[in-house]
UniProtKB/Swiss-Prot annotation:
This is Crossover junction endodeoxyribonuclease RuvC. InterPro entries: RNaseH-like_sf, RNaseH_sf, X-over_junc_endoDNase_Mg_BS, X-over_junc_endoDNase_RuvC. CDD domains: RuvC. It is an enzyme of class 3 (hydrolase). Mg(2+) 2 binds at E71. One of its GO terms (cellular component) is Holliday junction resolvase complex. Keywords: Cytoplasm, DNA damage, DNA recombination, DNA repair, DNA-binding, Endonuclease, Hydrolase, Magnesium, Metal-binding, Nuclease. It holds the Pfam family RuvC. Homodimer which binds Holliday junction (HJ) DNA. The HJ becomes 2-fold symmetrical on binding to RuvC with unstacked arms; it has a different conformation from HJ DNA in complex with RuvA. In the full resolvosome a probable DNA-RuvA(4)-RuvB(12)-RuvC(2) complex forms which resolves the HJ.
């Protein structure tokens, strides 16, 4: 018997961290919610990270997902910006882990391939396919749309992850 799994996808960013929640039952996907957690750019870094953590924690408490998926960040030429993005990504991994959720991570190309069929594509293609896959989906920012795409990617890949975890448990036990 198949069970409904509620998944939160998180698109980390220091200014805006997108979140999107879907329910997966077999091959069927249903939109639950999406949004963006923001931090105040005028505050110090530690305070901004606290804002992101508090915002994500509220979303997790409100929607009670079963699993989480976070996108890997890319390294750019600005080392300081990359480091700050990495710290925001740490919050995106920490909040669901603290809530007791298993957290999967996906490269941007894997997300694109799961949603649009190829590993390289434009954001507009991803956003359009999110709407095709879940016609009731709504998102107010690009970050929220990307987070929904991350959740969709996890819904497509989760069975192989679950099987691998079971195999590890059998080998360890």
């Amino acid at each position: 018997m198949k069970e409904t799994i509620r998944i939160i996808g998180i698109d980390p960013g220091l200014r805006r961290t997108g979140w999107g929640i879907v329910e997966s039952l077999g091959n069927s996907l249903h939109f639950i919610g999406s949004g963006t957690v923001t931090s105040n750019a005028e505050m110090d870094l530690a305070s901004r990270l606290c804002q992101l953590h508090e915002g994500l924690s509220k979303v997790l408490h409100e929607f009670m997902p079963h699993e989480a998926a976070v996108e890997h960040t890319f390294v750019n030429k600005d080392a300081t910006a990359t480091l700050k993005l990495g710290q925001a990504r740490g919050i995106a991994l920490l909040a669901p882990a603290q809530a007791g959720l298993p957290v999967a991570e996906y490269a941007p190309n894997a997300v694109k391939k799961a949603v649009i069929g190829v590993g390289h594509g434009e954001k507009q293609q991803i956003h359009m396919m999110v709407k095709v896959l879940m016609p009731r989906a709504s998102f107010d920012t690009s970050d929220a749309a990307d987070a929904l795409a991350i959740a969709i990617c996890h819904a497509h890949h989760r069975q192989s992850i679950v099987s691998a975890r079971r195999m590890q448990a059998l080998l360890a036990g």
